[in-house]
Amino acid sequence: MELDINGARIFFTLPIDLPVLGQLKISETMIVSWIVMILITGLCIWLTHDLKEKNISKRQAVAELLVEQANKFVIGNMGEKFRYMIPFVAALFATSVVSNLISLVGLRSPTSDLSTEAAWAVVVFIMITAQKIKTSGFGGYLKGFTQPIPVMTPFNILSELATPVSMACRHFGNILSGVVINGLIYGALAVASSALLGLIPGLVGDVLSQIPVLDVGVPAILSVYFDWFSGIMQAFIFCMLTVMYIANAAEEG
């Protein structure tokens, strides 16, 4: 049994040569990411259409529940002064969940490409740094690298840079491991199905051995964890780390 896992396909390259970055390539990750954003935007428009103060619909009740949970999550972990973070955290969670689960319809998950999580982590890192500078001032931020003693400066710098790296790799590693495990399971079940059905004598056995019967049903059960549970859990963990890092940055001052 061979397992071949390739990266995102490059569909076409734009005739644009950007400084440092080089040619602009349109990959499968970019296209699916746009599909994810369109789906989320469409869902938000549908949920918030024709809102009422009384006799609300089930659709509006769901929308209000989602907003209420987002408010509780951010304010409960960061405090009232970070209310402005609610739209960002909600958008980050929704994008991560839909990106993780979109593989269920046959599309390649954008989160199985490290560049996706890396981009999210860089944005979060910039917000963390901005909060530290806002709290302590630029001089205080730089001085923090020399604490508790100046000799610790290189280690503090590495620790600071490790934050976005660890956030990106944690999310990416868990999603990629699910892809690899699912691929191994599909391959193993196909081999087992061929071996078992091949025991049937005659033409019937020859025909049935070419059909991966065991691939039907069993992977669907396993996807409840690897796709649904793990996908939602990783999105929650990434958002939790985001709010905790930013909240801690405000307290350091």
Question: What name fits each language-model region?
Answer:
Residues 1-253:
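Selective transmembrane helix interface/packing segments
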